[in-house]
């Protein structure tokens, strides 16, 4: 992770690992295969993910494009950060404030 005065750059693999850990705590298993994210759960219905654009085969198994996954998990941060991403990294740029004061 690279932290600058007003931006944070996170390698995509680290970003996904962190998000997958959070999702696991909610009882949902997430896995990246190619450019798709596969979600599954034995006890949590994934209806909320379907409302957010996931393609669900049933209530417990969904898949969605990586871009949609990133949009979903970063939507709360968008009021404070400009969120940019590509296949290698996710960049958060502070909106009007510095993330690190030196």
UniProtKB/Swiss-Prot annotation:
Source species, domain of life: Viruses
Q: Which Gene3D superfamilies match?
A: 3.90.1150.90
Bilayer-crossing residues are none
Q: What is this protein called?
A: Uncharacterized protein ORF102
Which species is this record about? Acidianus filamentous virus 1 (isolate United States/Yellowstone)
Classification lineage: Viruses, Adnaviria, Zilligvirae, Taleaviricota, Tokiviricetes
